Amino acid sequence: MNFDYNKLLERASGVLSSKTKNESRLKIPEPDVIYEGKSTIIRNFIDITEMMNRDPEDVIKYLTKEFGIGAVLSGQRLIINRKVSEDEIQSKMNEYMATYVICYECKSPDTEIQKIGRTYLLVCKACGAQHPIRSNREIIENSNGIEIGKEYTVTIESTGSAGEGIARYQGYTIYVPKAKKGERVKIIIRKIKRNVAIAELADKK
């Protein structure tokens, strides 16, 4: 059976289109920063943490560790005990999002952190993925994406409406005709559109 990869890609993109509505939530507000003496004040700190749906104290612990300085919450504002540039603050906020908020699989921000034993897991409410919290370096090293014509090994996690296998890899949802749920298969990417890809089995008979 010959598959029309373009049609399959369009259908798959349509199925996942509702998930793209989350993209507007991926960008946190820019820090509203002012300086008083030697202190840096983020005036909209609580607005930022509410957008991320994370405990402000957890974000404060992350920032104080990254900057190596103390900080205190005062109402809606975070007061940092030395001057820090807006670019530095924005960079650390983005790193926090990538590490503790954004799903490593589908890139949805609808996640929560759960502790299982001694391990903290990032659990996605959108796709159901569960992964141990990674370091920012690990995320960067594993975020190179996929390329058309390249071969990858994936696990088929579910089945689409037309019977095609569905895998998730490097933030992409990959549709694989003839693949069955539970199989570990080698695939070749044929089409990519945003975070959706169509592949074929590398060892087709």
Curated annotation (Swiss-Prot):
Which domain of life does this protein belong to?
Answer: Archaea
TRAM domain location is 145-203
Q: Does the keyword Protein biosynthesis apply?
A: yes
What are the protein's UniProt keywords? Initiation factor, Protein biosynthesis
Q: Which GO terms describe its molecular function?
A: translation initiation factor activity
Entry-linked InterPro entries: IF2/IF5, NA-bd_OB-fold, TIF2_bsu_arc, TRAM_dom, Transl_init_fac_IF2/IF5_dom, Transl_init_fac_IF2/IF5_N, Transl_init_fac_IF2/IF5_Zn-bd
By its UniProt entry, which SUPFAM superfamilies does this protein fall under?
A: Nucleic acid-binding proteins, Translation initiation factor 2 beta, aIF2beta, N-terminal domain, Zinc-binding domain of translation initiation factor 2 beta
Q: Which PROSITE patterns match?
A: TRAM (PS50926)
Q: What's this chain's function?
A: eIF-2 functions in the early steps of protein synthesis by forming a ternary complex with GTP and initiator tRNA.
What NCBIfam families does the entry give? PRK03988.1, PRK12336.1
Which proteins does it associate with, and in what oligomeric form? Heterotrimer composed of an alpha, a beta and a gamma chain.
Query: In which family does this protein belong, per the annotation?
Result: Belongs to the eIF-2-beta/eIF-5 family.
What name has this protein been given in UniProt? Translation initiation factor 2 subunit beta
- Gene name, please? eif2b
